[in-house]
Regions:
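A short, conserved alpha-helix in the catalytic core of glycosyltransferases
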Residues: 206-233, 237-265
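A conserved acidic beta->alpha catalytic loop
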Residues: 62, 76-87, 104
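Conserved donor NDP-sugar-binding/catalytic core segment of glycosyltransferases
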Residues: 135-168
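Short, acidic, metal-binding catalytic loop of nucleotide-sugar glycosyltransferases
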Residues: 61-70
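Short, flexible, basic/aromatic active-site loop/helix in glycosyltransferases
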Residues: 173-213
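Glycine-rich, basic loop-to-helix element that forms the pyrophosphate-binding segment
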Residues: 101-119, 140
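Short aromatic/hydrophobic "clamp" motif used to bind/position activated sugar donors
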Residues: 124
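Active-site-adjacent helix/loop segment of glycosyltransferases
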Residues: 249-327
Length: 336
């Protein structure tokens, strides 16, 4: 790590890490917790990693370049021995890095809660292990918090490696109806009608100013630790996927405010873990059903929720064969 720090200055290295192929890129009162000190600039970063590749090293490089970082907590949910040897060596050199484990893959939500319990800073950042930040990302985000002290959670513009806004980075609240609208693109029937709002907003008109949104991605969630704890953290019913949507739903129900900051960017590579896709799709299907039963059992008759559950698992079954064949074929070709 020391050698890497000496090789490149901060601005140049951040630009290379973010966009290697681009030259031009480089109220918490609602939950009865105190507003963070306006002068607080300390943040604990929580990163949950499961079978993550070398992108984790790049992620950590971008984290350690940030101002305001007091602590980086890496939750090992089951990485390779080689990668963890590298992480342990890095922890010996970088005192801010703490490595903890739940002794196996305990799920994303539970791992986040485990990491937050170790956090010491007033602010916490939940960051995916395949995300790379520009210099001063956290510092600039904290300035937004200090200027808007009633904010519950902040996210930034999460981009794909090609610079496009990533799907799921900003969304409307997920309901059974918005899922139907999204799946069948019913918004095309009446594009401006509030009844036909799409779930994902990455194809909507780009936001130019800091804006309130209903739902964001768990790839980058910055908030006061008091907000996270007052909501009870992530719901551990969810093993993988949808826990971030559930968290946003609970913020919305509690009267909280989520802000999207479009002029701060983070690159999220996505799908960097070497995991059998059937495992991911199965837990995603279970999480969708958990979410709908948890939040909509009073609004929708049980038979409608059962239809949704049947549809979700049918979709899982249909997708299982092609995704599995593709994954195993890739393994054969690459010899991994």
């Amino acid at each position: 790590m020391d050698k890497l720090k000496k090789n490149l200055d901060e601005e140049k290295r951040a630009k290379i890490l973010l966009y290697p192929n681009k030259n031009d890129y480089a109220k918490t009162s609602f939950i009865n917790c105190d507003t963070p000190n306006a002068n607080s600039d300390h943040c604990s970063v929580i990163i949950v990693s499961y079978k993550t590749g070398s992108i984790l090293i790049e992620c950590l490089q971008s984290v350690f370049l940030q101002k305001s970082i007091q602590q980086v907590i890496l939750v090992d949910n089951g990485n390779s021995r080689t990668l963890m040897q590298q992480m342990n060596a890095l922890a010996d050199e970088e005192p801010r890095l703490e490595i903890i484990t739940g002794n196996g893959n305990i799920g994303f939500a539970k791992a986040c809660n485990l990491g937050v319990r170790r956090a010491r800073s007033e602010f916490i950042l939940l960051l995916n292990p395949d995300s790379i930040m520009e210099v001063d990302t956290i510092y600039k985000s904290l300035k937004v918090f200090h200027s808007k002290p009633n904010t519950s959670v902040i996210t930034v513009k999460i981009e794909n490696p090609d610079g496009s806004e990533q799907r799921g980075a900003r969304r409307n609240l997920m309901t059974p109806w918005t899922c139907v609208v999204e799946q069948f693109r019913l918004d095309r029937l009446a594009p401006n009608h509030p009844y036909f709002k799409r779930l994902n907003l990455n194809e909507a008109k780009p936001l130019q100013h800091i804006s309130r949104v209903q739902c964001i991605s768990g790839a980058f969630m910055l908030m006061p630790r008091a907000v996270y704890n007052s909501l009870g953290g992530m719901d551990e019913q969810y093993f993988l996927h949808v826990e971030d949507v559930d968290f946003c739903m609970r913020i919305e129900k509690s009267g909280g405010i989520i802000l999207f900051v479009p002029n701060i960017r983070v690159m999220h590579q996505k799908s960097s873990s070497d995991v059998y896709p059937g495992f991911i799709e199965w837990h995603k299907a279970k999480s969708f059903c958990t979410y709908f039963n948890k939040h909509f059992h009073m609004q929708y008759p049980k038979w409608i929720l059962n239809i949704f559950a049947t549809t979700i698992y049918f979709r899982f079954a249909v997708r299982l064969v092609p995704t599995s064949v593709s994954w195993f074929w890739k393994k054969i070709i690459t010899g991994v």
